[in-house]
Amino acid sequence: MNHKILKTLEYDKIKQMLQGYAITAFGQEQIATLEPINEADLIQIRLNQTKDGVDIERLKGGIPLPQLENIRPHLKRIEIGAMLNGSELAQIGRVLRATSAVVRFFDDLEKDELELKALPELVAQFVTLPQLTERIRSSVADDGAILDTASTKLRGLRTGLKQLEGQIRSRMASYTHGAKAKYLSDPIVTIRNDRYVIPVKQEYRGQFGGVVHDQSASGQTLFMEPQAIMELNNRLRQLQIEEQQEIERILAELSEAIMPERHNILANAELLGQLDFVNAKAQLAKALKATEPLINAENHVDLKQARHPLIDATKVVANDIAIGADYQAIVVTGPNTGGKTITLKTLGLVQVMAQSGLFITAREESQVGVFSDIFADIGDEQSIEQNLSTFSAHMENIIQILKQIDDRSLVLLDELGAGTDPQEGAALAIAILDQIGIVGANVVASTHYPELKIYGYNRPQTINASMEFDVATLQPTYRLLIGVPGRSNAFDISTRLGLPNSIVDQAKQLMNDESQDLNNMITDLENQRKAAETEYQALRHELTEATDLHQQLSTAYQQFFEDRETEMTKAKEKANAIVEKAEVKADKVITKLRDMQMNQGAQIKENQLIDAKAELGQLHQETTLKKNKVLQRAKRRQTLKVGDDVLVTSYGQRGTLIRQVDSKNWEVQMGIIKMKIANDDLEKQKVVEDNRPQRHVTTVNSGGARHVKAQLDLRGKRYEEAMAEVDQYIDAALLANYQQVTIVHGKGTGAIRQGVQEYLQANRQVKKYEYAPANAGGNGATIVTFK
């Protein structure tokens, strides 16, 4: 499809909305390359995927996907034998884990018997790699750090490092808290050049043997490594080197393991991107309240209450637009500013959305065509003061359109023939429309030339239309009226604004009879339309009342049978109780008669006694009624009240009843959403006590964290004082094994902030630093992450 029409219809804004919902790099790629297509089968597949996504969004909240980066460059590096770093491996690991999670998710959907049209075929293409997935998961953390579980050797080395660091801290404590503590600038232990040191006052350097590794900015403090711990520091450095070597070995091993599966991994990442795209389409459909269009291969377009998707839903006016079945050309006449241009753009944009596999902003059962291409000449300006250059530009555009259209094209022409002499412009417009009709393309053209009103009546497969204007308010309603040509409202408007009737009457006399007759005909048509609309609304109201009455009667009829069954059950239970008492009495009588026969020789036969008892037993009625659908529904129905936990069956979501809206509906709180739900859509849920044992979480305190806070506040400090505190604080935080700290320096003149960041830039223990989020101080605080 030509890109000019996409720009004219602002198709890129729809894509921008989609991109706001995508969370993977490959999903963003899918959206960036999205364009309308003209193959009906492929369009239907895309729409089926969107439909599946909408169903999953409604029932499950969407397909579970994490944020995923573009791993294509990493896999290309592996092809040339490069070793990936931890961060790159972590990104690949996320793709592998997401693949497994998505496959499990769709397996669960299949067990739940959720019918999907297209996505199962897509998901079947995934290649899960459980062994490689687990290997990366157990070796690389999400931030790219190599885990202790990556290898036995690495775990042993890190255990040794921790033990050795403990020994060094213990030995250093004898300096910071012993007799020589008075020679220190501060009783702390810090790190310089990857070695543990203590801050010694310049004048007391002779009190300590060892090596000076650094000094403070003022030169008053020397950072010395005491002779007594030099051997421990040497051993520590050796273990650190061995740790790094083991990490590099693990990275190389994992990179080598990925090599044979790189194509499958890339294919999985691209499939995840497609599912992310489906999620985005579903969320866009939800945001726009869009529906699934029906594809009509014969290009019969029938949009029911179509809305422009880029206009505020609370302000946009919906219109019915139909073309291609009963007529192939619509001529929209009438004055400017009535909404003709928006109507053209609505038709075009809704059509390209459908041909892109997106849901459309129209009511359900709306039909769209499959056009080979869509062309438009739509200007942004509608001023009557158009000059020749504007007319020439429009004509050049229309000439190109006429060269390219075929019988499967849709053409949208705004203010056809404008910008030149009205008589010539109208003649050109008629000739252009005739040529488009000869080709067989569908066309919607707007114009304010009255001559084209006659055209709509004289040409086959052509119909007039107009934008409604409310003379009472002197405002356009933006409603499209198919079959009614537009008419000038100049006389009515002038009269309402106060122009003397004599002037208006004289103006009417100056009009030729043909124009006057045409306006009268249009007025009659509009009156007929309004009468038909009034009748339609009355019939619709009666139909609604009849539907409500039918529903009430059905409910009462159902309740009657339920009550009847209940009363019959009670009656039978009562009758059975009477019969049981009679049987007991009968047993006593039979026993007495049997005794009389044995004792007195009476002529009473045994079978007569048994038959008599059987007849009594036949009076017993079953209290359990036969199964019937009405009773089963009645048994399932439970009395609902405010505060009840319920299941909304159509959404598969639980909620709580807030209030009863009417006899048929309740207001239900589902999470942060309140919705009006019908009674038949609610199932009362039992409140289940959560007796699961509480999970106890064990916390481990960092070694030196008891005396070091995770935040340093420098506000109100002088520059030199602040920088000295930063130096001491960073060392203390490293000793306390903090992974991340925050330095609050305020905004002010920025001198301390700049000094802090220059210090962090030069410190080799700092992995990265960045400003805090806006809600946590913004550029008034810096978050520091250590290696």
Curated annotation (Swiss-Prot):
Domain Smr per the UniProt entry, residue ranges: 712-787
InterPro entries hit by this protein: DNA_mismatch_repair_MutS_C, DNA_mismatch_repair_MutS_core, DNA_mismatch_repair_MutS_sf, MSSS, MutS, MutS2, P-loop_NTPase, Smr_dom
PROSITE patterns linked: DNA_MISMATCH_REPAIR_2 (PS00486), SMR (PS50828)
Pfam families linked to this entry: MSSS, MutS_V, Smr
Statement: the UniProt record of this protein carries the keyword Cytoplasm: no
Known partners and oligomeric status: Homodimer. Binds to stalled ribosomes, contacting rRNA.
Keyword annotations of the record: ATP-binding, DNA-binding, Endonuclease, Hydrolase, Nuclease, Nucleotide-binding, RNA-binding, rRNA-binding
Record EC number: 3.1.-.-, 3.6.4.-
Molecular-function GO terms, alphabetical: ATP binding; ATP hydrolysis activity; ATP-dependent DNA damage sensor activity; endonuclease activity; mismatched DNA binding; ribosomal large subunit binding; rRNA binding
Enzyme class: hydrolase
Top-rank taxon: Bacteria
Protein name from the UniProt record: Endonuclease MutS2
GO biological process terms held by the UniProt record: mismatch repair; negative regulation of DNA recombination; rescue of stalled ribosome
Described function: Endonuclease that is involved in the suppression of homologous recombination and thus may have a key role in the control of bacterial genetic diversity.
Gene designation per UniProt: mutS2
Residues that coordinate or bind ATP: 334-341
Family affiliation: Belongs to the DNA mismatch repair MutS family. MutS2 subfamily.
The keyword S-adenosyl-L-methionine appears for this protein: no
